[in-house]
């Protein structure tokens, strides 16, 4: 090794094994954070969710992407099929299933297949969807005494963190035991952003209620070990989609403005050359 190479190494250090680990001109301004899976969502969840929903509302490409994914993932609905060899039993089960499909929605707005599409859409836009299993009384007259209630992720306060006297801990609204297992969800009775407009606002809507984890299906995509909350699926494309939307708008206005200008060539005598 020459004296020049030794001097360079002393001044700037040895070349890194990986280019991205170096401090060259291309990486000098790249100073990423490295929060844990729980801390990352605590810091960014509300912002990402708000921007994701805003973009889906006003951006045709984002909306089309969500609609296409839901159509491909759910279609007309994911349907179970009995594998029983008893044809009579199979027919009875399928008939019972068809009856329950129409009664599955606790809000009474759609059927079970509609709930699948709605849950998938909520997960894509907001990062997660909470599905509460609501047991019903026999006198309610349902074919199966069970209904499903879909809740947006805002019902589960991500900033709710506490250490309980029982030894359990609450992290991002979810209660864990000392083995790290989910034992309960602490949910708002109504959507916190609806205020007095929410149907449950008069029943302590801004207070949380503890729901056993067995009654909750927490639908989200796990991307990291230890992750407890979901992130919107458009998170990595939000900035570019927003910039593309603004560019497209500006280009449209530019062309519209240019089309409004017209020029005329006049001459004294029709026989004169231009």
Model-derived segments and their meaning:
Residues 2-63, 67, 110-114, 120-274:
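Structured, contiguous alpha/beta core segments that scaffold functional sites
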Residues 70-105, 116:
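Low-complexity, highly charged intrinsically disordered N-terminal segments
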């Amino acid at each position: 090794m020459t004296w020049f190479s030794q001097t360079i190494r002393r001044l700037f250090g040895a070349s890194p094994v990986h280019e991205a680990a170096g401090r060259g001109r291309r990486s000098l301004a790249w100073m990423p954070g490295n929060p844990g899976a729980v801390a990352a969502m605590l810091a960014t969840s509300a912002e990402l969710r708000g921007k994701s929903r805003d973009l889906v509302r006003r951006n045709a490409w984002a909306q089309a992407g969500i609609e296409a994914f839901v159509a491909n993932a759910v279609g007309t609905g994911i349907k179970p099929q009995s594998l029983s060899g008893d044809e009579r039993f199979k027919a009875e089960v399928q008939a019972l299933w068809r009856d329950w499909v129409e009664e599955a929605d606790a809000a009474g707005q759609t059927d079970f297949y509609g709930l699948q599409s709605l849950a998938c859409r909520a997960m894509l836009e907001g990062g997660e969807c909470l599905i509460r299993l609501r047991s019903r009384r026999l006198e309610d007259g349902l074919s199966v005494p069970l209904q499903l209630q879909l809740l947006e992720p805002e019902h589960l306060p991500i900033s709710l963190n506490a250490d309980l006297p029982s030894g359990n801990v609450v992290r991002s609204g979810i209660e864990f035991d000392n083995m790290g297992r989910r034992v309960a969800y602490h949910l708002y009775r109504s959507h916190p952003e609806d205020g007095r407009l929410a149907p449950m606002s008069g029943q302590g809507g801004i207070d949380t209620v503890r729901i056993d984890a067995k009654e909750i299906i927490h639908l989200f995509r796990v991307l990291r070990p230890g992750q407890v909350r979901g992130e919107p699926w458009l998170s990595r494309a939000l900035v570019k989609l927003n910039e593309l939307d603004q560019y497209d708008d500006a280009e449209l206005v530019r062309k519209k403005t240019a089309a409004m200008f017209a020029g005329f060539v006049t001459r004294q005598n029709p026989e004169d050359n231009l």
